[in-house]
């Protein structure tokens, strides 16, 4: 089943979901705690309505795990007998009547513990845990990680088929100027046609289709913290894959020194003569005081060496620029519900 169909099935609002009883001992933390590379348990007690029955699940209840596969998102279901089961199926319950109440990402490598990147041991990303009251604001929480309990970031760079894969998936072709993404159905896509390139405009539009945004400079600096600074990968990665040296504290993978990512910020030169400029691809014109409107690139690319890093940024490129070393990464707000 495609991500697009998953999103179409997500018809209830978050508040409607919570209205079906889900009450944790505290709303100030996520329900789950990582207890090992591939194990987890509840870290607070919770009462959950499953069908017509309210089930009490105590703190310290283990989640039954399947054989975990690196780079995969798992849903956590509460069974009618009170047990917890993780599966990689996010739409069909593992047993009749089970209710999905959270999930996590099983990453291909560990998060950074200092400012020297992560490791290559596949494990649960503890910052990817979510539940019905602690989650990203976008409809689909998969492939995301919580940055400093402030906002959520896509773990992976944008891929070429986000309607199928979501905007953040492991082992797929990275979207860039040479391999632009398919136009999302929300903006008239037919499942086949791609953008002509990957300009700032396309980046913002793609993420908007899934309830996300490109990061601000401040957000990027935070999400990329913990990478091995002033280093690059050395070659075009082509696909979303582990680059442990440039994994951040929060488990953002290929965070720097792989492909540049478009930012949300734009700047305009206030000098010269202001005129209307036809630079918005047939969707109106932009009044600026210089030849163009500029946007930021963050993180550094695979050949940038010491220029790459969590605070690396370029501010000299037009919003209409597109190239093979420019991609995107989505972010969205953090939601806490009582």
What are the roles of these predicted feature ranges?
Residues 1-16, 336-338:
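Short, intrinsically disordered N-terminal pre-domain segments
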Residues 12-72:
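Glycine-rich, flexible loop motifs
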Residues 69-84:
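Elongated alpha-helical scaffolds
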Residues 80-84, 157-160, 227-228, 265-268, ...:
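Acidic glycine-/aspartate-rich tracts in secreted/extracellular proteins
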Residues 80-94:
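Short, surface-exposed terminal/edge motifs of secreted or surface/virion proteins that either
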Residues 107-253:
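Short aromatic-cysteine micro-motif
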Residues 197-198, 286-338:
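Disulfide-stabilized, aromatic/cysteine-rich ligand-recognition loop
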Residues 209, 219-303, 333:
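An exposed tryptophan-centered "aromatic clamp" motif
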């Amino acid at each position: 089943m495609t991500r697009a169909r998953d999103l179409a099935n997500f018809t209830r609002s978050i508040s409607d979901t919570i209205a079906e009883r889900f009450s944790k001992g505290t709303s100030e933390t996520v329900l789950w705690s990582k207890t090992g590379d591939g194990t987890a348990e509840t870290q607070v007690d919770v009462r959950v309505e499953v069908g017509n029955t309210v089930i009490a699940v105590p703190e310290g209840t283990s989640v039954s795990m399947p054989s975990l596969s690196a780079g995969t998102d798992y849903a956590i279901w509460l069974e009618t007998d009170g047990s917890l089961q993780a599966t990689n199926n996010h739409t069909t319950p593992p047993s009749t009547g089970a209710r999905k109440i959270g999930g996590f990402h099983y990453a291909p490598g560990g998060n950074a513990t200092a400012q020297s990147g992560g490791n290559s041991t596949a494990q649960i990303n503890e910052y990817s845990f979510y539940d019905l009251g602690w989650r990203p604001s976008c409809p689909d929480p998969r492939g995301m990680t919580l940055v400093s309990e402030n906002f959520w970031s896509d773990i992976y760079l944008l891929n070429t088929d986000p309607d199928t894969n979501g905007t953040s998936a492991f082992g797929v072709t990275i979207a860039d100027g040479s391999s632009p993404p398919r136009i999302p159905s929300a903006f008239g896509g037919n499942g086949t046609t791609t953008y002509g390139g990957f300009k700032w405009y396309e980046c913002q539009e793609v993420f908007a289709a899934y309830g996300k945004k490109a990061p601000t400079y401040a957000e990027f600096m935070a999400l990329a913290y913990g990478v091995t600074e002033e280093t690059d990968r050395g070659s075009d990665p082509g696909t979303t894959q582990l680059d442990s040296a440039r994994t951040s504290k929060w488990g953002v993978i290929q965070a720097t020194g792989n492909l540049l990512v478009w930012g949300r910020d734009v700047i305009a030169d206030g000098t010269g003569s202001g005129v209307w400029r036809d630079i918005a691809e047939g969707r109106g014109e932009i009044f600026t005081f210089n030849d163009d409107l500029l946007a930021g690139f963050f993180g550094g690319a695979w050949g940038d060496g010491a220029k790459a890093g969590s605070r690396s940024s370029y501010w000299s490129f037009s919003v209409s620029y597109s190239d093979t070393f420019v991609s995107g990464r989505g972010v969205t707000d953090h939601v806490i519900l009582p």
